[in-house]
């Protein structure tokens, strides 16, 4: 269930937050088609930078989500020390190389959080529709020379892995694609811009993104990360 509140500025645009989301769902492929997906997999490359703009770390992962509500899946980190975490039928596992790792309760919680965070990112805007999200239309703004709708998102505590984070989404006013997001994850504020989209499947997924750390006044601090997505594969349910 989505609860929507709207500020007076909604009257100016004649669109509510829920209407903006509905159009974004269609622009990204449609909620009905999304609910028919059985398996979603892709490759994600992350490059981290320090404050001087020097590459700090590079990580390539193959992520897969499948089953009802995508509660099953695996995340494989590719490299010299290949690691794998998975959730299969409620069973949590982690391996490094060919060796399985004994999991503590903290390890299980970390794996669960990693999966929820990864799914949260890749499933937008559909997750905004499926989750118990509170959407608040905030204003119009200009982003990269184009009109953009700004919508704040919050969650009820203990009902979403990102409940403690404060999210704001930016929807292009013409295409209704999500073109950026801002998140306050104490103590940092990040502005994540969707630079390119992948439309090789029936959906408009992320292809290239950049995450910029912001100062408290909202000004740019430095580029923290770039993300490249590729090799998307979607398998639909038989029925």
Model-derived features: positions:
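N-terminal mature ectodomain segment of secretory-pathway/periplasmic proteins
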Residues: 13, 26-100
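Flexible, processing/modification-adjacent segments and terminal tails
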Residues: 13-19, 93-163, 238-239
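C-terminal motif of bacterial Sec signal peptides marking the signal peptidase cleavage site
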Residues: 6-9
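Intrinsically disordered terminal and processing segments
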Residues: 16-18, 27-31, 78-80, 128-141, ...
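Short solvent-exposed loop/turn micro-motifs enriched in small/polar/acidic residues
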Residues: 55-57, 77-78, 133-134, 162-164, ...
């Amino acid at each position: 269930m989505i609860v929507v509140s709207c500020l007076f500025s909604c009257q100016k645009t004649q669109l509510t937050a829920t209407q903006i989301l509905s159009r974004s769902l269609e622009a990204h492929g449609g909620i009905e088609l999304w609910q028919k997906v059985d398996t979603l997999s892709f490759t994600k490359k992350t490059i981290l930078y320090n404050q001087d703009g020097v590459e700090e770390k590079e990580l390539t992962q193959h992520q897969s989500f499948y089953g009802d509500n995508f509660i099953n899946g695996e995340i494989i980190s590719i490299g010299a020390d290949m690691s794998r975490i998975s959730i299969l039928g409620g069973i949590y596992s982690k391996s490094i190389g060919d060796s399985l790792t004994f999991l503590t309760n903290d390890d299980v919680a970390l794996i669960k959080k990693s999966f929820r965070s990864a799914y949260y990112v890749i499933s937008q805007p559909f997750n905004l529709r499926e989750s118990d999200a509170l959407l608040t239309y905030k204003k119009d703004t200009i982003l990269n020379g184009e009109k953009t709708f700004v919508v704040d998102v919050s969650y009820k505590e203990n009902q979403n892995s990102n409940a403690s984070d404060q999210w704001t989404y930016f929807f292009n006013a013409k295409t209704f694609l999500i073109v950026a997001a801002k998140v306050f994850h104490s103590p940092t504020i990040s502005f994540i811009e969707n630079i390119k989209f992948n439309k090789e499947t029936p959906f408009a997924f992320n292809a290239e993104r950049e995450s910029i750390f912001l100062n408290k006044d909202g000004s740019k601090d430095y580029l923290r990360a770039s993300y490249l997505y590729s090799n998307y594969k979607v398998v639909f349910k038989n029925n």
